[in-house]
Amino acid sequence: MQFINKQSEQLFIELKAFFKQYHVFIKERQYYLEALTHNSYANEHNLSYTYQRMEFLGDAILAKEISLYLFLSFPDKNEGEITNLRSKIVREGTLAELVRRMNWAPFLLLGKGEIKTKGYEKNRILADIYESMIAALYLDLGEDVVRTFINNTLIRMVSNPGFFDKIRDYKTELQEFLQAGDARTLEYKLIKESQPLEGNRVLYTVVAEIGGIRYGEGCGYTHKEAEQLAARDALQKLATKSKYHFEK
């Protein structure tokens, strides 16, 4: 427990330095420790808390703040249009990208097993952390500080022209489509790996299989890029066979 206390002290010092960049001066250490504690870390260290409760609160706060922002910023858009915008802003892939850009991964408290499986790269965990930290800020410093922080981070990022074209998460879209009414298993398989090309880069070819049937194929210089392109290809093909609307 002494190690955890020392680690938490150093972590809080680093967090204070991070938030100071945004003119945010955090106070209550425990809120932020809880917001950063994954259940795998809590299990290993016999802690009574994880970030899940904070994530629950942060999710609600974020939905409210983004709804208010969109309502005030786009008076000419109808309910359906602003709902669609909100879903794009608060979706997992968008929040995860923001956390990557802010370099919050080193602050995460993960168990050894989760570290081994690169939990600090998983979209779900990164998105959860943004929401849980929003809750910590709300409990520590209040609504006005949270609103300003969201505007200076999330809103600023998504306001860049063409942002959503760059960040679109086709893998998540495909998974959500299947979960909505298709019980078949989705798998990504590496079928080809090129010899090192210019700059020692390797080109990977991945296929997306649904229920053992190949639906999509993609090539990229990383596994992640190839999987995203395979998912995009699969979504386009599914759009021709179902009522799914593929938004290009």
Swiss-Prot record:
Quote the EC number: 3.1.26.3
Q: Which cofactor does it need?
A: Mg(2+)
State the UniProt keywords alphabetically: Cytoplasm, Endonuclease, Hydrolase, Magnesium, Metal-binding, mRNA processing, Nuclease, RNA-binding, rRNA processing, rRNA-binding, tRNA processing
Binding residues for Mg(2+): E55, D128, E131
The reply to whether Cell membrane figures as a keyword in the UniProt entry is no
Where it sits in the cell: the answer is:
Cytoplasm
- Which reactions is this enzyme annotated as catalysing? Endonucleolytic cleavage to 5'-phosphomonoester
Name the GO terms of the biological process aspect.
mRNA processing; regulation of gene expression; rRNA processing; tRNA processing
Which catalytic residues are annotated?
A: D59, E131
InterPro entries according to UniProt:
dsRBD_dom, RNase_III, RNase_III_dom, RNase_III_sf
A family per Pfam: dsrm
Q: Which NCBIfam families match?
A: RNaseIII (TIGR02191)
| Assembly behavior | Homodimer.
Q: Which HAMAP family match?
A: RNase_III
Known function: Digests double-stranded RNA. Involved in the processing of primary rRNA transcript to yield the immediate precursors to the large and small rRNAs (23S and 16S). Processes some mRNAs, and tRNAs when they are encoded in the rRNA operon. Processes pre-crRNA and tracrRNA of type II CRISPR loci if present in the organism.
Q: What is this protein called?
A: Ribonuclease 3
